[in-house]
């Protein structure tokens, strides 16, 4: 017998925070990906530019650790950013085997464009929530994430 309402989620799932977070994350990821693609960018571009802008020049390995991107993906994304002159690579004066990556003025302008686009995406994602609930949700998600990413005791 076929379920007469195939889009209705079982109550056991709909009441699980893990299920709700996963489903929301899938939709959020799609919105971010589509939003950035509309301005010819990717999420890795934003993450790398934001990391460089906040922390300054860094090695590719440090960028990967700080932005949560695997080193092989860092290299590919940096190649794309360098082609557009949003970043420059130069040999590290203290270790010539390593490159130091620096954001350029064009990269900072691109970062501002991406921030504006991502603000629109956040508004779309969180449309049903008023500003105070958006802030509450962000605070609660940050707390849960911090709990699960802190080093073991």
Stretches found by the model and what they are:
Residues 15-19, 39-50, 72:
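Short alpha-helical elements of helix-turn-helix
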Residues 64:
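The alpha-helix within a helix-turn-helix
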Residues 1-39:
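N-terminal leader segment of winged-helix/HTH proteins
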Residues 57, 61, 79-142:
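Charged, amphipathic alpha-helical coiled-coil/dimerization segments
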């Amino acid at each position: 017998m076929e379920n007469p309402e195939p889009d209705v989620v079982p109550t056991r799932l709909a009441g699980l925070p893990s299920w709700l977070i996963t489903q929301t994350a899938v939709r959020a990821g799609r919105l971010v990906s589509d939003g950035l693609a509309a301005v010819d960018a990717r999420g890795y571009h934003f993450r790398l530019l934001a990391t460089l802008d906040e922390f300054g020049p860094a090695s590719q390995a440090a960028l990967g650790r700080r932005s949560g991107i695997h080193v092989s993906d860092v290299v590919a994304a940096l190649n794309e950013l360098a082609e557009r002159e949003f970043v420059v690579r130069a040999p590290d004066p203290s270790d010539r085997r390593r490159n130091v990556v620096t954001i350029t003025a064009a990269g900072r302008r691109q970062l501002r464009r991406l921030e504006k686009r991502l603000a629109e995406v956040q508004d779309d994602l969180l449309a049903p929530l008023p500003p105070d609930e958006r802030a509450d949700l962000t605070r609660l998600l940050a707390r849960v994430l911090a709990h699960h990413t802190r080093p073991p005791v």
